From Swiss-Prot:
Isopentenyl diphosphate binds at H43, H81, H131, S226, N228, S271. Binds 1 [4Fe-4S] cluster per subunit. Dimethylallyl diphosphate binds at H43, H81, H131, S226, N228, S271. The lineage of its organism: Bacteria, Bacillati, Bacillota, Bacilli, Bacillales. This is 4-hydroxy-3-methylbut-2-enyl diphosphate reductase. [4Fe-4S] cluster binds at C12, C103, C198. Its cofactor is [4Fe-4S] cluster.
Length: 316
């Protein structure tokens, strides 16, 4: 079996930055305890489990405000997905110490929405409902931001002005966004478009589109909650024309997927730890359908290997 290691794949700079911020917080003895992450720091359970070992508690829930209601003291880390001004204000009112790990690409979109609101615009925001990134973006200006996920959402959308900006969640499929923007253009011809697919998402999607077409199967390593991982599987199937499965780690690979397969493409979401992806590749490289000794699929990567290393500051 030949393995096509799609490149680039895996961690993006926004994810690494967020994890380094959280790890440094865990090492900072001056921060009030306990330390919480408001939602998953990035959408990967292996990462959140590793942070639990670092003493950082991940709290998840339907919305950031609802999660915040569970916290009465300590330090709160805002995730890479960003939060609304209301969440920041509520944390301040509760007297919590806050650390912002928002991805710079998300902050850029928030700033754009604020600027356009000041100019009297309404904003159509393309994103996944019940995902934290759109929650934060809509929360910047909920009175003028309209969240849509698919073309059907446009049927009932009415906007009381011709001044309309269209932007999007950074981890969407660039092809889905383009198609939706074309539909929006037809209904709102005066709309201005500002595509905000982050560069890391874009190049990973394009790599799958260009490199997965030579494979019989694509395996995307990523958490089920990771939108960018799920979009990579979608791109493989819809753009490259190659069947794809998303797995959280090697233990989720089903042997029947590999029957009759000669070429397997492997990629990983932007929040997937590199050791987890390497373990998947190592399994596929040694797999022999005729040798049961090669069939074991057990995640063995220790949690200590999941998070990026940070330098420990020496006490003066």
């Amino acid at each position: 079996m030949k393995i096509v290691k799609i490149s680039p794949r895996g961690y993006c700079y926004g994810v690494v930055d967020a994890m380094v911020i959280a790890r440094n917080a865990a090492l900072d003895k001056s921060l009030p305890r306990p330390i919480y992450i408001l939602g998953m720091i990035v959408h990967n359970k292996h990462v959140t489990d590793a942070f639990e070992e670092d003493g950082i508690i991940t709290l998840d829930g339907p919305s950031r405000l609802e999660i915040l209601d569970k916290i009465d003291s300590g330090t709160v880390i805002f995730t890479a997905h960003g939060v609304s001004p209301e969440v920041k204000q509520r944390a301040k009112e509760k007297g919590l110490t806050t650390i912002d790990a928002t991805c710079p690409d998300v902050t850029k979109t928030h700033d754009l929405i604020e600027a356009k609101k000041a100019e009297g615009y309404h904003v159509i925001y393309i994103g996944k409902k019940n995902h934290p990134e759109p929650e934060g973006a809509v929360g910047i200006a909920p009175d003028i931001v309209h969240l849509i996920e698919r073309a059907d959402d446009l049927k009932t959308l009415e906007i009381p002005t011709d001044k309309i900006l269209v932007t999007n969640q950074t981890t969407m499929s660039q092809w889905d966004v383009q198609h939706l923007m074309e539909d929006i253009q037809k209904k709102f011809p005066t709309a201005e478009f500002h595509k905000e697919i982050c560069l890391a998402t874009q190049v990973r999607q394009e790599a799958v589109a260009k490199q997965a077409d030579v494979a019989d199967l694509t395996i995307v390593v990523g958490d089920p909650k990771s939108n960018n991982s799920n979009r990579l599987a979608q791109v493989s199937q819809e753009i490259a024309g190659t069947k794809a499965y998303r797995v959280a780690d090697v233990s989720e690979i089903q042997l029947e997927w590999l029957q009759g397969v000669e070429n397997v493409a492997v990629t990983a979401g932007a929040s997937t730890p590199t050791p987890i992806t390497k373990e998947v590749i190592a399994f596929l490289e040694q797999y022999n359908p005729m040798n049961p000794a090669t069939w074991e699929r057990v995640r063995k990567v220790p949690l200590q290997k999941i998070l990026p290393r940070v330098k420990v500051k020496k006490e003066q």
